[in-house]
């Protein structure tokens, strides 16, 4: 059977051989950063911006990947080209770059990093129905990271608190998406997405101090500006989510996903709301593909 190709430590290899040793610090200590993009009809979206964020994360955690950002970009594009014959009509890929500190015992051991790139088909069926009904967002007990311990702007795989938050949310509703608070009780983010609310025609989202600075978040602001819809970052509390007219999540693979309920409380008259719809349509026009229709075609 023909399988997808991955990249690991200088080699393009079958995906089934893309493995790291159990002594790798990425596995043992979560000492690894990553980034992720998606394709639209095979064309990758904003790769350079994602790689720039990856390199900021690498600089912050003091891991030298051993290659330039231009080289990382070229390898990513080559990997996509090698896997394009397996993509299939109507499908698209998630693209994932990761860099761990390698197989050292301590963080300062002089060992080479582990550098990898993978592609995998987007699981449209896992979320497509929420374009019609709106997702259910649940605020769990587990809180998000504090910048005093690990800055949320770093995109990393040390995600045990996110796993606990997801379990707490799915205890309430097996299909729920967790929305974490920060240590001060402000809304922060979902485990893989930024959260937005719409109240009185104004789009608001948690400010940059307690969240990952999402590329998709930036896209939402750009589209809102183009559509003439006011949008801003702000400190938000659960009250703001409960009383919003609309809400949505924004991330790499689903772009914009309407939210219909927060902690079982319905939002507005119907999800998706009118501004959420306008943004999703504008994003579809931006990438030349009907994002909602593509996802719905897989259910």
What are these regions (language model features)?
Residues 178, 186-208, 213:
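Glycine- and Gly-Pro-enriched alpha-helical subdomains that act as flexible
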């Amino acid at each position: 059977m023909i399988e997808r190709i991955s990249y690991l430590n200088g080699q393009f290899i079958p995906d089934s051989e893309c493995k790291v040793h159990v002594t790798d610090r990425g596995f043992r200590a979560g000492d690894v950063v990553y980034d992720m993009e998606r394709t639209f009809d095979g064309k990758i979206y904003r790769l350079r911006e994602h790689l720039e964020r990856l390199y900021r994360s690498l600089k912050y955690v003091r891991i030298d990947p051993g290659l330039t950002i231009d080289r990382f970009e070229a390898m990513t594009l080559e990997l996509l080209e090698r896997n394009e014959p397996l993509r299939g009509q109507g499908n698209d890929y998630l693209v994932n770059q990761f860099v761990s500190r390698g197989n050292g015992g301590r963080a300062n051991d002089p060992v080479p990093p582990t550098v990898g790139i993978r592609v995998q088909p987007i699981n449209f069926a896992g979320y497509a129905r929420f374009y019609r009904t709106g997702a259910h967002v649940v605020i769990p007990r587990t809180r998000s990271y504090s910048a005093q311990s690990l800055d949320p702007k770093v995109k990393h795989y040390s995600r045990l608190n996110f796993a606990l938050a997801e379990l707490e949310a799915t205890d309430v509703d097996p299909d729920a998406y967790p929305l974490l608070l920060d240590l001060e009780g402000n809304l922060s983010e979902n485990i893989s997405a930024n959260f937005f609310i719409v109240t009185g025609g104004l789009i608001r989202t948690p400010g940059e101090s307690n969240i990952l600075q999402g590329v998709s978040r930036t896209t939402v602001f750009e589209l809102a500006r183009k559509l003439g819809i006011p949008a801003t970052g702000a400190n938000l509390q659960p009250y703001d989510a409960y009383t919003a007219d609309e809400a949505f999540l924004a991330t790499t693979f689903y772009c914009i996903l309407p939210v219909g309920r927060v902690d079982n409380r319905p939002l507005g008259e119907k999800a998706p709301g009118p501004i959420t719809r306008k943004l999703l349509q504008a994003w579809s026009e931006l990438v030349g593909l009907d994002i909602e229709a593509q996802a719905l075609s897989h259910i």
